[in-house]
Amino acid sequence: MSITKDQMLEAFAAMSVMEVVELIEAMEEKFGVSAAAAVVSGGGDAVAAEEQTEFDVVLTSFGENKVAVIKALRSATGLGLKEAKTMAESSPIAVKEAVSKEEAATLKADLEAAGASVEVK
């Protein structure tokens, strides 16, 4: 007669915490393993070196030429006149989020050419 996984899980669920700890210790001893999590060192550098692939374009100020910035916002986002005007006046505000590096650079150049101050994050 073989015990199924479900029967084992039910037995574990019925155990107290101390009984589970004793069971784990016995399993570690029997199989020569440890339940402690392995510590990996040096992993932080790999994450820091990973290149960012998505960027947010943030309008920080519309500058002196608000009309030109509103036109640039409309062409870049497809917004209507009222929405683009509200966006320009609400700076700092994200114009587009999670865009590629090339699209972010193009959008930044277009808005700066219109007189806006823009950050790419």
UniProtKB/Swiss-Prot annotation:
The keyword Repeat does not apply. InterPro entries: Ribosomal_bL12, Ribosomal_bL12_C, Ribosomal_bL12_C/ClpS-like, Ribosomal_bL12_oligo, Ribosomal_bL12_oligo_N_sf. The keyword Ribonucleoprotein applies. Keywords: Ribonucleoprotein, Ribosomal protein. CDD domains: Ribosomal_L7_L12. It comes from the Bacteria. GO terms for biological process: translation. GO terms for cellular component: cytosolic large ribosomal subunit. One of its GO terms (molecular function) is structural constituent of ribosome. Disulfide bonds: none annotated. Signal peptide: none annotated. Forms part of the ribosomal stalk which helps the ribosome interact with GTP-bound translation factors. Is thus essential for accurate translation. Homodimer. Part of the ribosomal stalk of the 50S ribosomal subunit. Forms a multimeric L10(L12)X complex, where L10 forms an elongated spine to which 2 to 4 L12 dimers bind in a sequential fashion. Binds GTP-bound translation factors. Belongs to the bacterial ribosomal protein bL12 family. This is Large ribosomal subunit protein bL12. It comes from Shewanella frigidimarina (strain NCIMB 400). The gene is rplL.
